[in-house]
Amino acid sequence: QEGYLLLKWTPNSNDYFSAIFRGLNNDIRNKAHFDGRYITENVDNSFQTDQSETTSHGGMLGSIYYEHTFKDNSILSSYAKYNYGFSNANQENVEKNTDNVVPTIVDYNSRRDQYKVSVDYDSGEKKYGNITSGASMEYTMDKDYNYVATPTEKLHTKRLNSFAYASYANGIGKLYYMASAGVQLLGISTDADKTTHWRPKASASLSWQLPHKQVLRANYYLTNSLPETSQLTAYNTSINPWYRIEGNPYLVPVMIQNIDLKYDKSIGDFMIRIYSSHNRYNKMIESYVRTEDNIQIESYRNNGTYIGTNVGSYISYRAKSFKASFSAEYNWDKYNGQSTKGYVDLNGYVRWDFGKFFLYSTFVWQNKSYTAISHTEYHNPIEAHVQLAWQITKQLYASIAMPYYWGTRSQTNITEMSGYTMNNKIRFKSESLRPWLLVSWTLYKNSKLRIDDRNPDM
């Protein structure tokens, strides 16, 4: 269930107010059965596993946004948000083999209070260029309860992400440039540790318009990312009796650097792009596995530098009633202390408008993906969507779609560590070959007085 309310008000041409209220509640129930083999140096037995899961998550959000435009067309904006979230999970795993039956239960819930405020100033385009500046603060408090432990285990996690910045943009002839510099304050507080980190935050870009509809772009950014609360929470969230998953309350933020290069060429209705990007994650948070009392424990650690690079090409065609695009790229991943691993990524999109109808389809295929301790092999496309829509009247809309038309989507997850290997093949039956039908009726009144939505992304 979901509810959404957007209020907008413009008392005059220079002031804009808006407020958003949103509520969400999702309940999920899953059951699964697995057949496999348990193999050691002395034993080779078949086993079966039955799993059941009941989860619910959701929350409430409220935000306020204000924007003032000065006489010189510069803009001052401010934003405030409060978010309350909850998540409850009850999972049971029963493993049966030749010798015994092993039940495992996970029962926990989480509560979140999150606050965010920001202020930004934009001078607009002036003879001297464009100046922007601002500051933002987001504070998140999470409470997690592990009901499997006796007594109930209570964990508290607090995270702070705040920054201030200033940027300048201008152009000289066909060359456009932008530079931004700032400082970021990040704080992490758990029941086991408390740390504060001051880090630089920066970005820069160059855009050069060449003759014959050619554009060359280069972008750089430096930012920092906090660990997720789930990576900090130090209790088991796995129902596999032989494989525990738990967080690490001593993690520190990751520093992220990215460089992008793009070359665009337009030829009539076609656009061709060649691109490359390079990413470096210092103090990378990655998974690792250790062994304690013959149990494998997956956790997280800050482990050196991760490097990711890709090169690719993109072509698109845009006519009045037909659009299509296709991209192909090759990616390299390198985790600290490991060899470089590569994979291929293909994306396609088609849309055809005819009369009051339009037909569109998307396609995404990837052969593999990697983490520090595992890789996933995809046996068919990750995404294969087709949809036909009919705008019957201005108010009445109907659509029929097949979210996944390429048979039954499946993949194999392979975890390989010293002394431990796990292969897990997953078939997404509920997502495959399940068409849906949508009919919507929209009420319009005084549409000429409609106010634009200027809220920032939440």
Residue ranges and their predicted role:
Residues 212, 224-273, 280, 297-309, ...:
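Outer-membrane beta-barrel signature, preferentially recognizing the C-terminal barrel domain
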Residues 205-207, 426-458:
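Outer-membrane beta-barrel "beta-signal"
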Residues 1, 30-47, 88-97, 143-152, ...:
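Outer-membrane beta-barrel translocator domains and adjoining extracellular loop/strand segments
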Residues 19-21, 78-80, 133-135, 179-181, ...:
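Membrane-embedded beta-strand positions of outer-membrane beta-barrel proteins
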Residues 278-285, 295-369:
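Gram-negative outer-membrane beta-barrel transporters
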Residues 164-170, 200-208, 276-278, 311-317, ...:
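Feature captures outer-membrane beta-barrel proteins of Gram-negative bacteria and organelles
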Residues 4, 8-26, 53-193, 197-199, ...:
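Face-selective signature of the C-terminal outer-membrane beta-barrel domain
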